[in-house]
């Protein structure tokens, strides 16, 4: 918590920013005239997110006198959706594909993302001009009851639905009549062509609905209990704000919400217009670039983990590297190679802080054993998700899940056969079970650089890990301190590699594997030789995250770059959440399916005009009107609309032929705030 000299008495309007990450929930109280007045952190409580939210918010409220009655806006950013995709988690969802076939699953990673979740194919869809192929609902009607028993949400993707959404709407209405499941339509998420990738985006959105709903419900419930009557906003992946109601319908847009908020916060806290921003959290490190004070956007759609979506978001490069990253021993080598991530574990020091007896007892038993065991230093516990989210488990998964409790148990007790390890991994992927193990956070406790949790558990965890053997037969390390120093060095190196990987990608330089390049290795280690290698970013590094002051001075030194760690670096996401704007963009298309006939498609509308000027006028008006309405729905007070167009109309044999016209309207403004 950032301390103040006694309760701060305020008379002006206050904004409350909240960021819910995988490990911590942050809160800030912000005034447009005085900046950050108070900030605090509390552990994120996945089984009941309201506990973490209330813990952080109550602390900042206690620092500012009369704050509750002065709060006019609450804004929320989160890394939960990002972390879920990085770690392969999310609820089970059913996919309904209209006009597609099984062969389309092979494109854009859709089959991999779908996994064992059910898919139903329907005849139907439209062509590029919005003309339909007849829709056959019979297969869905026959399977809908069974489907509703095994999934938590439904995703619908229709062929060329962005040009005519009628079939997606018909399927959506049927699902809503027959079930109470949340439904996502692809045309509501993107106006871009590319059916399989739009289907992928829709599927991921459906999987995230329950997770984001739990966060918004927890936050809303807490605010109501405290009598805080202010609009609740959520940060989108491009840094803009949307209302909580809109976020519930389009949770996929909150992927990279936390990182986007951190970029907005970094600009606000440092005043730097041009910078490389690296935000290290518990689960991920997120790297992006500020150009002229504005985050670079990813024109191809946000990539998170293995998936490239159609969500417009900051050009953020997300790496499975953080303070809670899994420490892994690279098997097979003569020397003991260590690597971090991409999976997040609960640090042993945190697990013992929350449950001292079972964790310390388990580690002490393993440390005193005659020889190291395969599962030493690992514990399993339930995340506490509602029982409904455990639907669709196989008998083997259900049996193992029943044996796992809300309190950590050693893996060598939980697992009775090696085949159960794969079963456990599936439960982890569903977000039902969390593994505790040795992480960089534990290493920092061993070295005395962090002290907020149980240092004895960290030391015992390091001792147990040290007993593992490299290919040479030697132990991984001779002491807990040696192991911890190696983990710290590994985190520094992988963090530097993450920054370079992101910058090379932004420069369009491909074909260089930073982790394997001898050139990069010589540059980062500054190894002596006949040739001196060097590599240096052209702008300063802004380091964010609670552990940034611990890790990033060494990262900046390795990169030979000037660095800044702002005063409120640990809560930059929460700051960014309250200083952003609402921004909505709507695109309407005009095509010429036949000579003298002009099709207007977009914003849920399909119309035919005989006059090109009339079609253009309708498209321009529709885009502007819908963008303004969308901004108002998303919580803007007085949105300002900007219009642009791109008309592709070549002259062929002396005649103009319309290929496509795009009319783009963007409405933006500050969010509405509660009356004083």
Each language-model region and where it sits:
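N-terminally biased helix-coil "hinge/interface" segments that flank
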Residues: 2-676
């Amino acid at each position: 918590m950032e301390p103040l000299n006694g309760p701060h008495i305020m008379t002006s309007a206050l904004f409350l920013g909240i960021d819910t990450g995988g490990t911590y929930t942050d809160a800030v109280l912000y005034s447009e005239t005085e900046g950050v007045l108070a900030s605090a952190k509390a552990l994120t409580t996945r089984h009941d997110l309201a506990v973490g939210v209330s813990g952080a918010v109550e602390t900042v409220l206690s620092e500012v006198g009369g704050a509750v009655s002065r709060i006019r806006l609450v804004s929320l950013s989160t890394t939960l959706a990002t972390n879920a995709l990085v770690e392969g988690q999310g609820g089970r969802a059913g996919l309904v594909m209209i006009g597609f076939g099984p062969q389309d699953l092979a494109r854009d990673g859709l089959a991999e993302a779908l996994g064992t979740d059910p898919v139903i194919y329907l005849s139907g869809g439209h062509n590029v001009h919005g003309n339909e192929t007849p829709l056959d609902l019979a297969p869905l009607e026959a399977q809908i009851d069974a489907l509703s028993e095994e999934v938590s949400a439904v995703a619908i993707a229709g062929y060329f639905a962005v040009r005519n959404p009628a079939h997606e709407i018909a399927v959506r209405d049927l699902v809503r009549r027959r079930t109470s499941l949340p439904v996502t339509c692809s045309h509501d998420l993107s106006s871009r062509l590319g059916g399989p990738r739009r289907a992928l985006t829709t599927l991921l959105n459906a999987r995230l609905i329950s997770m984001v709903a739990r966060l918004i419900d927890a936050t809303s419930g807490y605010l109501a209990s405290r009598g805080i009557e202010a609009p609740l906003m959520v940060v989108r992946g491009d840094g803009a704000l949307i209302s909580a109601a809109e976020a519930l319908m389009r949770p996929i847009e909150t992927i990279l919400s936390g990182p986007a908020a951190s970029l907005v916060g970094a600009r606000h806290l440092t005043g730097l217009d041009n910078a490389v921003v690296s935000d290290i959290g518990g689960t991920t490190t997120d790297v992006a670039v500020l150009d002229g004070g504005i985050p670079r956007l990813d024109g191809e759609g946000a990539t998170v983990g293995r998936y490239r979506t159609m969500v417009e978001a900051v050009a953020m490069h997300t790496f499975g590297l953080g303070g809670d990253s899994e420490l892994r021993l690279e098997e097979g080598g003569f020397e003991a190679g260590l690597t971090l991530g991409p999976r997040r574990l609960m640090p042993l020091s945190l697990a013992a802080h929350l449950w001292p007896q079972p964790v310390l007892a388990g580690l002490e038993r393993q440390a005193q054993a005659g020889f190291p065991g395969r599962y030493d230093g690992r514990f399993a516990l339930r995340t506490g998700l509602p029982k409904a989210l455990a639907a669709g488990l196989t008998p083997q998964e259900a049996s193992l899940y029943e044996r796992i409790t809300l309190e950590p148990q050693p893996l060598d007790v939980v697992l009775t056969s090696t085949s159960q390890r794969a079963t456990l991994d599936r439960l982890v992927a569903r977000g039902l079970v969390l593994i505790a193990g040795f992480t960089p956070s534990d290493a920092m406790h061993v070295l005395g650089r962090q002290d907020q949790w149980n240092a004895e558990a960290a030391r015992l965890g390091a001792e147990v890990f040290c007993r593992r053997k490299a290919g040479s037969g030697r132990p991984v390390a001779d002491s807990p301190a040696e192991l911890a120093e190696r983990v710290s060095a590994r985190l520094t190196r992988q963090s530097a590699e993450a920054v370079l990987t992101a910058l090379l990608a932004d420069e369009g330089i491909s074909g260089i594997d930073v982790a394997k390049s001898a050139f990069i290795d010589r540059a980062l280690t500054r190894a002596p030789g006949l040739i001196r290698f060097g590599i240096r970013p052209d702008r300063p590094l802004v380091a964010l995250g609670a552990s940034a002051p611990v890790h990033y001075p060494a990262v900046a030194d390795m990169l030979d770059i000037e660095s800044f760690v702002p005063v409120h670096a640990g809560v930059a996401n929460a700051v960014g959440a309250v200083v952003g704007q609402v921004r909505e963009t709507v695109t309407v298309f005009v095509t010429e399916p036949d000579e003298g006939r002009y099709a207007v498609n977009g914003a849920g509308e399909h119309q035919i005009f005989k006059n090109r000027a009339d079609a253009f006028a309708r498209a321009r008006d529709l885009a502007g009107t819908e963008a303004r309405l969308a901004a108002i729905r998303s919580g803007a007070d007085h949105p300002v609309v900007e219009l642009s167009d791109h008309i592709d109309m070549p002259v062929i044999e002396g005649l103009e032929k319309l290929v496509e016209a795009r009319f783009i309207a963007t409405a933006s403004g500050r969010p509405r705030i509660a009356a004083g």
